[in-house]
Amino acid sequence: MAAATAPKTMPSSVFAAALLLLAAAACQASPYYPLELGYYRYTCPQAEAIVKASMEKAIAQNPGNGAAVIRMLFHDCFVEGCDASVLLDPTPFSPTPEKLAAPNNPSLRGFELIDAIKDALEAACPGVVSCADIIAFAARDASCFLSQGKVSFDMPSGRLDGTFSNASESVKFLVPPTSNLSDLASSFAVKGMSLEDLVVLSGAHTVGRSHCSSFVSDRLDVPSDINPALAAFLRTRCPPNTTTSDDPTVMQDVVTPNAMDIQYYKNVLSHTVLFTSDAALLTSPETAKLVLDNAKIPGWWEDKFEKAMVKMASLEVKTGHQGQVRKNCRAINHY
């Protein structure tokens, strides 16, 4: 019998290079960790298609449905992370959840739409798809439909639903539309979001409606930079003193009200935006340049918006034992 030969050793330089390649491959394989693309490919392969079909129908009926779920994603993710806590109804043990907070009530919409999508998913794959992922998928699809496909991106999933919701947290993390740039930037920085993310995500104000109470006091009742013609128009639509029973809504973008496009940035430049928080983007050289770039460079905003949406939808997600998959998006499971 021939003597066994000793195995050849790998040169240290080759071994080190191999480790680097493995590390690079690992990073490339899971850029959205702890989320992943195609999370439901085995457990509910039709999940994303069900959400997409539901959103297509809802937006065809009313484009405002798309704007509502895009806003809902922001209001969910900035408070306790992307965990569908904004969907929870009040209970005797939690009488003031996020949805009753001033930033959400009565302006946040889309709850019934999410309920309908959840019902469809429960019929297809009971107990599998989280409400948090439904919001994320719905916002992704709304962006695509409202932009006529110009905003199109993959949304990683695997979020779990939270079990805590308190209105005070919404007030803490969702700054009002009367905010200046410093307050806006601080609210984004706390969440690890950049000044560019702030400017890019503000572009979602190109769709949807706003209650008059969100801008009358600081844009119409006092001197502001708002375009005089727009101010005159708004005064025909908004009472000088809004109340809970007299608080009409107006389009945020009167030029292309139902299109996800760069018109918002053109409106900022022409001082035809509703909110102080929108006008504030022109109060620093850095953000003013970003506004101009988004308004002028073809495809620039769409690309940045796609990346910022995924980044926002990955904030403080709950996985593993941190959450649950709710059976009803409005209530936590009781086992």
UniProtKB/Swiss-Prot annotation:
Keywords: Calcium, Disulfide bond, Glycoprotein, Heme, Hydrogen peroxide, Iron, Metal-binding, Oxidoreductase, Peroxidase, Secreted, Signal
Induction section of the entry: Induced by wounding and ethylene treatments.
EC number(s) reported in the record: 1.11.1.7
Sites where the protein binds Ca(2+) 1: D76, V79, G81, D83, S85
Disulfide pairings: C44-C125, C77-C82, C131-C329, C212-C238
Positions that bind Ca(2+) 2: T206, D253, T256, D261
Catalytic activity: 2 a phenolic donor + H2O2 = 2 a phenolic radical donor + 2 H2O
EC class name: oxidoreductase
Matches recorded under InterPro entries: Haem_peroxidase, Haem_peroxidase_sf, Peroxidase_pln, Peroxidases_AS, Peroxidases_heam-ligand_BS, Secretory_peroxidase
Listed GO biological process terms: circadian regulation of gene expression; hydrogen peroxide catabolic process; regulation of circadian rhythm; response to oxidative stress; response to stress
Lineage, highest ranks first: Eukaryota, Viridiplantae, Streptophyta, Embryophyta, Tracheophyta
Active site location: H75 (proton acceptor)
KW Zinc (keyword) present: no
Cofactor comment text: Binds 1 heme b (iron(II)-protoporphyrin IX) group per subunit.
Homology family: Belongs to the peroxidase family. Classical plant (class III) peroxidase subfamily.
Site (Transition state stabilizer): R71
Tissue spec: Expressed in the elongating region of young roots, and in root vascular tissues and epidermis.
A Pfam family of this chain: peroxidase
GO CC terms, sorted: extracellular region; plant-type cell wall
Protein name: Peroxidase 2
Cofactor(s) the protein requires to work: heme b; Ca(2+)
Role noted for this protein: Removal of H(2)O(2), oxidation of toxic reductants, biosynthesis and degradation of lignin, suberization, auxin catabolism, response to environmental stresses such as wounding, pathogen attack and oxidative stress. These functions might be dependent on each isozyme/isoform in each plant tissue.
Glycosylation positions in this chain: N166, N180, N241
Biological source species: Zea mays
Residue sites binding heme b per the record: H205
